[in-house]
Amino acid sequence: MITLVDPNDSRAVRNKDNVLALYDLMIDRKKSEEATARFVGSTYVQHDPLIADGSDALGKYFGQVTRQRAKARVVVHRIIAVGDYVWAHVNFLNLFNDDPNDTGVAGVDIYRMDADGKAIEHWDVLQLVGDPKNSAPWVAPNVPRANPNGMF
């Protein structure tokens, strides 16, 4: 994992640590309600149209996902924290299927954190990973990649 955070910015370090702990507890350890109670503020604003506002809604959404998908997990490839903002480049695996060869969904999550280090706002950009030989598996699965660079 690549981490970009000023070690002298204690707020940014704490916020980065809290986002990593949120992912671990909510998705990898399947304790979403506990995770959101600890790391998400009650006034949480969600910009992903699939999930309602509020920490309870986030906990319920991922609780349902992880109860249905025992293999669900997240791999954090990059994380950047500056002040109240944390950006994470992640790969969500087995959120939507149980395929052991699932390539998952790539995401960039952006969190705004409050003074207590809890997430109070979230944006994301999501993209299917798909076959690494294809350029755009969600639009044109038969178009070959134009470069050898991986998604992560």
Predicted feature locations:
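C-terminal and inter-domain tail/linker signature
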Residues: 1-152
